Amino acid sequence: MTNVWNGMVIFSTTIIWTLLLVSIALVTFGYIYYLKWAKTPLPQLDDQHALFVTIMVPAHNEGIVIVKTVQALLNFNYPHDRYEIIVINDNSDDNSAELLANLQKENPTRSFKVINTDSVTGGKGKSNALNIGFKSAIGDVIAIYDADNTPEPNALRYLVAELEQNDEYGAVIGKFRTRNKDVNLLTRFI
């Protein structure tokens, strides 16, 4: 019986140390990658001739997070006359419509459009909301952000630069951070 216990202790100790070493390696290499990435220069774009981008944000009952998302989009380090923002308020029954209307009033000189759907045209999911937004889009490039994402100021510049530098690319994706990840069980799985 003591041989079994000794074997279990050795096995458990080995597993714990292995997991600890793997965790240390991941943190170390992650930090090294971060330091390397932080030194990457900002992509150079010809601001006069930058691609025109349509940014679409489908939103359903996202009043808690939509204001910060739109403000982050309005603050992009990208020529303001070279992108438009379309928020598709997909049949929300919270205060999303009011909040978005206030943002439009606060930013009258920006290309910022809100499409409010009703129970007939909306409420059929993200893909339907995006299809509604596509009808109004005029950009050479389409960027899609979820309503609970907060893109960093240079995010659009990096994405467009990547597309411009690689003719064979049809799409690119950037990293994101979700602000409401701890709100409920569903958002914890994101």
What is the meaning of each model-derived region?
Residues 104, 108-109, 116-135, 153-190:
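Long helical/loop segments within the catalytic core of UDP-sugar-dependent glycosyltransferases
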Residues 142:
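Short aromatic/hydrophobic "clamp" motif used to bind/position activated sugar donors
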Residues 80, 89-99, 119-121, 150:
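A conserved acidic beta->alpha catalytic loop
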Residues 51-54, 84:
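Cell-envelope/extracellular polymer assembly enzymes that use nucleotide-activated donors
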Residues 67, 94-103, 154:
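Acidic helix N-cap motif at the loop->helix transition within catalytic regions
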Residues 71-82:
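Short, acidic, metal-binding catalytic loop of nucleotide-sugar glycosyltransferases
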Residues 1-49:
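N-terminal membrane-anchoring/stem segments of glycan-assembly enzymes
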Residues 62-65, 92:
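Donor nucleotide-sugar binding loop of glycosyltransferases
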